[in-house]
């Protein structure tokens, strides 16, 4: 009967183990797992849709890696700009789509948080730009940015049916019809300084190329500058010599001008006298 004092402790250990098996503890998902989900994540039937998740370049890369692990999952990625009115309008519709398609993870990325090489990889030349991606495909949306059209695009690419009628999604969204273009172009809205600012490696590469070109063309540039400077110096010296000569010998120059004027007057008088004397001799 020596094991009777240890019986309560044994029963407590069995109860704790049974409770652990019945109700496992859900760990907090990371930012990338919150976008596309994870096989190890707890999938409760009462779990609400996550809506739109704001991300950056690093979160996008991790989300793509998780999509390769979950081959049946889809994610919608919207690249937008806060200064673009079309992006603001599309951002509201993107939130509507997150409610219409709760099984598709929605990631919104603002243009200031994405490096330039990511823009080149996805071919982003204007805002807003929408992609549907999974482990095998990456489809860009081209068409009218209405909730109904976007929902049809989701259905065609992913095969997922909407959870509600997409026709009611545009009721409280006022379209921007005061502009002629349909997209805010990236290159026309940013200066070269702002383009080089987000990516340090691009700045260093551009600086190296510029310095390399200067090194290659430096002899030619130097020779051209020397020739131009020598010609300019020679012309300046000639002009200065001419002015000095005029200051040193002003009388001779004046006498030459006076002599030329007198010679012209004498020639005109001689011609006049000859023309007058001809009738008297006849």
UniProtKB/Swiss-Prot annotation:
InterPro entries: APRL4/6 (IPR044606), Thioredoxin-like_sf (IPR036249), Thioredoxin_domain (IPR013766)
GO-annotated cellular components: membrane
Domain Thioredoxin residue range list: 20-159
Main location: membrane
Keywords, alphabetical: Glycoprotein, Isomerase, Membrane, Signal, Transmembrane, Transmembrane helix
Membrane topology: Single-pass membrane protein
Regions that span the bilayer: 205-225
CDD domains reported in the protein's UniProt record: PDI_a_ERp44_like (cd02999)
PROSITE patterns: THIOREDOXIN_2 (PS51352)
Sugar-modified residues: 134
Signal peptide from the UniProt entry: 1-19
GO MF term list: isomerase activity
Designated name of the protein: 5'-adenylylsulfate reductase-like 2
Organism: Oryza sativa subsp. japonica
């Amino acid at each position: 009967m020596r094991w009777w004092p240890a019986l309560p402790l044994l029963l407590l250990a069995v109860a704790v183990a049974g409770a652990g098996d019945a109700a496992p503890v859900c760990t907090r998902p990371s930012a990338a797992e919150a976008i596309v989900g994870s096989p190890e994540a707890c999938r409760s039937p009462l779990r609400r849709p996550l809506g739109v998740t704001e991300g950056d370049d690093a979160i996008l890369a991790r989300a793509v890696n998780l999509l390769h692990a979950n081959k049946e999952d889809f994610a919608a990625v919207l690249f937008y700009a806060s200064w673009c009115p079309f992006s603001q309008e599309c951002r509201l519709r993107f939130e509507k789509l997150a409610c219409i398609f709760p099984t598709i993870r929605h990631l919104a990325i603002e243009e200031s948080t994405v490096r330039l090489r990511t823009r080149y990889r996805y071919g982003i030349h204007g805002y807003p730009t929408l992609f549907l991606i999974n482990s095998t495909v990456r489809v860009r949306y081209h068409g009218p940015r209405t909730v109904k059209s976007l929902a049809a695009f989701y259905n065609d690419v992913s095969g997922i049916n909407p959870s509600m009628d997409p026709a009611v999604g545009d009721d409280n969204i006022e379209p921007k019809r005061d502009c002629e273009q349909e997209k805010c172009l990236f290159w026309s809205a940013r200066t070269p300084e702002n383009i080089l600012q987000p990516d340090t490696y691009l700045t260093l590469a551009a600086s190296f190329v510029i310095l390399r070109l200067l090194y290659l063309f430096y002899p030619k540039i130097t020779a051209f500058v020397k020739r131009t400077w020598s010609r300019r110096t020679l012309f300046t010296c000639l002009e200065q010599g001419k002015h000095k000569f005029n200051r040193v010998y002003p009388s001779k120059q004046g006498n030459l001008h006076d002599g030329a004027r007198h010679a012209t007057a004498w020639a005109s008088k001689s011609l006049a006298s000859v023309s007058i004397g001809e009738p008297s001799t006849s």
